[in-house]
């Protein structure tokens, strides 16, 4: 399904197309000493996968990440693989990053080093993986991508709601010596009363009614 890619940047791709594998984003603020050093970077095309070996609670042996954002370049420290068969982009994005599926494969095709795992390419390429038809791949990939979009939408709504709450906490309580808040419900116009906290609670005694 995949072959190791060692295609290097010929210098025509600049740092504006540098891809951060961990977050799968273009990141152009990385300092590169010379144009020649740029040529040590691998080309990282749409649909390629790269191995990111940092171990975590979620990914015990590291993980693969698929490039789903567009053609670019990545540091030569990453192992890059290119698909050699017809496939669905979204299906493989989720399959190759699925710890439940990949843990047994990576357990046999990586070796531990300090704080991370190194991929043994030949061992990885000799592993097997259950694959549905391309038609079924497309349906699975589209469904999972739709769920991701829904999650993103709800996360944005959640952040907007948190900002609204913070704003209303400032506006619905009197500020800076004022006796009334800036925002009130209809029907309330009187000043808020200044009270001692001790006036608002009775003493609670333990052990008895």
What is the role of each PLM region?
Residues 1-8, 184-208:
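Non-catalytic DNA-recognition/assembly elements of restriction-modification systems
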Residues 9, 77, 109-115, 192, ...:
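Non-catalytic beta-sheet/beta-sandwich ligand-binding modules that flank or precede catalytic cores
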Residues 16-30, 72:
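Short, basic/aromatic beta-hairpin or loop at an interaction surface
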Residues 29, 33, 38-101, 120:
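A short beta-sheet element
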Residues 68, 115-119, 173-175:
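Short helix-capping and inter-helix turn/linker motifs at the boundaries of alpha-helical repeat units
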Residues 72-77, 111-138:
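A short glycine-rich beta-alpha junction/loop motif
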Residues 92, 128-166, 177, 183-198:
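Amphipathic alpha-helical segments
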């Amino acid at each position: 399904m995949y072959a190791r890619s060692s295609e290097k940047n010929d210098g025509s791709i600049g740092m504006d197309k540098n891809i951060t594998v961990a977050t799968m984003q273009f990141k152009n603020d990385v300092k590169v000493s010379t144009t020649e050093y740029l040529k040590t970077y691998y080309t990282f095309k749409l649909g390629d996968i790269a191995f990111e070996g940092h171990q975590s609670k979620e990914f015990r042996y590291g993980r693969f990440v698929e490039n789903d954002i567009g053609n670019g370049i990545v540091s030569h420290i990453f192992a890059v693989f290119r698909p050699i068969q017809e496939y669905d982009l979204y299906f493989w994005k989720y399959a190759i990053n699925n710890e439940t599926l990949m843990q047994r494969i990576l357990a046999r095709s990586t070796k531990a080093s300090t704080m991370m795992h190194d991929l043994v390419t030949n061992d990885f390429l000799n592993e097997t993986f259950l694959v549905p038809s391309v038609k079924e791949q497309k349906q699975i990939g589209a469904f999972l991508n739709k769920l991701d979009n829904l999650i993103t939408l709800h996360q944005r709504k959640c952040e907007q709601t948190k900002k609204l709450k913070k704003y209303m906490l400032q506006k619905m309580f009197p500020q800076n010596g004022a006796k009334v808040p800036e925002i009130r419900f209809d029907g309330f116009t009187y000043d808020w009363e200044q009270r001692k906290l001790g006036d608002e609670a009775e003493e609670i005694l333990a052990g008895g009614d």
